[in-house]
Amino acid sequence: MKDTYTVVAFDFRGHGEHYCENETDMSQDTLVNDAIQVFQSICTMFSDRSIVIVGHSMGGSIATKAAAKITGEHKGEAWARQLQGLFVIDVVEGSAMDALPFMENIVTSRPPEFKSLQSVVQYGIKSGTVKDLESARVSMPPQVVAKTDDVSGTTKYVWRTDLLATKPYWEGWFKGLT
């Protein structure tokens, strides 16, 4: 597969190790524009390739809206013609919208901090966020950042993104998919 395909993955603002000027603007329009900028860069790097966008959950919603904008507003541009497909995984507007009233409780029930990265991984498994240990080891640590207490010098791990601060954007991520 590596001889035929190139996989490029990026972290949205507020995710993983990506930092940007306005971390708290997680609006649909901002995330779509971020994704399009990444897509344009990929098209420049791989100008002779056809490109397929893949997105999961919120990323799938944003991928859908970015692909629509690329094939609509940008359809005459050479880079936009490289888009040859879209795969969306685990995004259904109805079920996503139905779950939104419960999201605040889910977010506030998470532990605010952890003593170690191992405890972050264990939380991912115990909470059902991730099903297997190897996946948890890959996907959970980028969701937290180390924070050192100035007085005691001890390090704890806190959530990378304040998910409650993104609440005003939740509906916009999923509305209009069907």
Briefly describe each language-model feature range:
Residues 149-178:
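Conserved serine/cysteine hydrolase catalytic core
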